[in-house]
Amino acid sequence: MKDFAIIKRDGSKDRFSLDKIMNAIIKAFESVNEDVDLASVSKIVSHIDVFDGVTVENIQNQVEQALMREGYYNVAKSFIIYRQLHSEDRETLEKLKFLTDYCHAANAATGSKYDANANVEHKNIATLIGELPKSSFIRLNRRLLTDRIKKMYGKELANEYLDKLNHHFIYKNDETSLANYCASITMYPWLIGGTTSIGGNSTAPTNLKSFCGGFVNMVFMVSSMLSGACATPEFLMYLNYFIGKEYGLDYWEHADKVVDLSAKQRTIDKMITDCFEQIVYSINQPTGARNYQAVFWNVAYYDKPYFESLFGEFVFPDGSKPDWNGLSWLQKRFMKWFNKERTKAVLTFPVETMALLTKDGDVIDKEWGDFTAEMYSEGHSFFTYMSDNADSLSSCCRLRNEIQDNGFSYTLGAGGVSTGSKSVLTINLNRCIQYAVKNGLDYADYLSEVIDLCHKVQLAYNENLKELQAQGMLPLFDAGYINMGRQYLTIGVNGLVEAAEFLGLKINDNPDYLHFVQKVLGLVEKYNKQYRTKDVLFNCEMIPAENVGVKHAKWDREDGYFVPRDCYNSYFYIVEDDSLNVVDKFKMHGAPYIEHLTGGSALHMNLDEHLSKAQYRQLLRIAAKEGCNYFTFNIPNTICNKCGHIDKRYLKKCPNCGSEDVDYMTRIIGYLKRVSNFSAARQKEASRRFYANGTNEIKE
C-alpha cells in the first residue's frame, strides 16, 4: 500500500500507517487471549480498502467486517467494545472541554456551541445544564428523522439529506429540541377549562386576578412544549373581558375612579397597570423549562376593521361578544404603559405587532394609523403588519385564508390564532448557487433538487410529529391550543443577497436583482404549492438567522466559497450599505420582492434618531403604497452601565450622569436585547449596521 492521507475525527489529515492497523488487530486478539500469526493478520488486512481521504471511522468499520468475515467473532466483538469505550471517553472529554470554554466565554450567547441566543442573558449552572445535552439531542433528532425518511423515500434520500446537512447546503433549525417550533395559540381552551388539558391543575379563570396569574402560568406551560415563540393574539381581548366583568363595560370612560378600599386607594387605571406589571415582568423572567431564558412571547394589536374581520363572530363562554371600545382603549393604554416602562427596565417581551388594514395606499382606520405613528414618534419599538384585503384573513394576523393562493404566516409566531410553524428547514442559497455555477450546472435546476429534498424531509418530520401526537405527547394539539392542520412546515432561505453578489448583481432596486429574487423565491413557492395538501401547509421565510447567518458565512468561507461578510443578511438589501435611503429599503421589501415569501421577511428600518409623528405617518403611507407588509423601526436605546439610566435616543454618553460607559438595546433580529448580550459575532455585525438619518430624508 502506498502513502495515503487519512482524515482523523477532528477533521485533520495524517499519513496512513499500516502498522497502526496491524497493531490494533493484534491487540484485539490479545484482549480475548487468542493466538494470531502474521499470515492471519495479513489476510484480515487484505479485506480493507484504503484510499486517499479515507476516514478513521471507515477503516475501523472495515476492520470489524474483515474480522467477522474471517470468523473471528469474539475478536470482532472485543474490537467493537473497545471502539465504543473510546468513543464514550472522547465524548466525555469533549463535554469537559465545552464546559471549560463555556465558563470562560464572554457571555452565554458566545459560549453556546450550537445555537447562540441573546435571549439568554447570563451564564450560570442552569444555562450550562441546558447546553450540555444539546449534541445528544442533535444526534437523536437526526436519527429519528433519517429513519422516517428511509421508511417513506428510501435510504438513498436519507443519505442525501445527511450529506446536504453535513456539507452546509441546508440547515435544520432547532435540532437541539424535540419540540415543534413556534405557535400562535388560541386561549379559548384555557378560558373554559384552565390548564388541566395540558397537564396543569388550575381551573378556568373567574376574575381579573385569577386571569393575570393563570395567564402567566399558562404561557410558561405552553412555551415549555415549544422550541420557539409563543404568541397570544387574544391576550388583550380576554384581559378587556375580565376588566369589564370587574368594573363594568364602560370602565375606560372613568378610569380615574377610585375602586380600591385599601390604604393605597387605587384607581381603575392603576389596577389595570398593576395587571400589566404583574404579567410583563413575570414573563420576562428566565424560565427553568427553557434553559433559563425568558419565554419568547408575542402579542398583537388591531385597528377596528382588522379586529372586526378576525373576531366579529367571536363569543365568550357567557354568550357576550368582545367590546371594541374597551379593547381599543386598553390596547392604547398598554402600549403607552409598556413604552414608558422600557425606560425603567430592559423588557424584551412581549414582541408587539400592530395589525392594520389598508386601501388605496393608506390605512383604512385613520385613528389607528395616527396612533401607530404617534407611538413610533414617542420612541416605542414594535412591528407593524399591513394587509389590503380583509376577506383574505382568517383568525390570524399573519395567516391569509387558504381560499387565497398564497398563505402567509410569520414563524416568530406573532399574531395568529391556533397557527404557527411546526418545523423550519433552511436552504443556504449562497452555497447552493455557487456550487451549481462552479460545477457547470444550471443553478435553478440544482436549487429545484435541493428544494424538493427539503419538502420530502419536512413531510417526514410531519409524520414523526403526528406519531408523537398519537402517543399523547403533544397535549397542546389535543387540547386545541394549536391546530395541526393550520401549522406550517417552513422552508427557510438564507444567503440570498450574498448569492446575488456572487452573480455580479447590484443589490439595489433594479430589474436584474428583482428578477433574481423572484426566480429563486418563486422556485420555493412552486414546490410549496406542489406539496401542499388539505392536511399539510408549506410556507417560505427569509429566516432571521440570529445564529445560522454567522455559521453559514464561517462554513462557506472555510470551504472556499465567495463570502462578502461575516454574517449573512436577513434582508433584501445589504445591512451595512449607506447608499440606500429609507424609501429605497421600503421598496426593496415591497410587494414585488416579498411576493413569494409567504412566511415573512421583516424590514428592520435602522434609523439614527426618532422621526416626528407626521414623518412616521408618511412612512405608513409609503409602506402601504409599496406593499411592504411587515416592518419595524430600529433606533438603539442607550443604557448607562454606571447609573442604570435608559434613554430612548441613540447617544454616546448618559444624559443623566454624563458617563460614556454605555450599552445599547437594539433588535438582534426580531427582539430587543442589550448588545452586550449578543454573541461576539453578532456584536461585530451590529457594529457594521448602517443607521440612516430619516429626519432629513422623509418629508412630513
Question: Where do the model's predicted regions map?
Answer:
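Charged, amphipathic alpha-helical regulatory modules used
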Residues: 1-108, 483, 685-691
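Short, hydrophobic beta-strand segments
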Residues: 4, 46-50, 312-313, 498-505, ...
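Long, charge-rich boundary regions
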Residues: 656-700
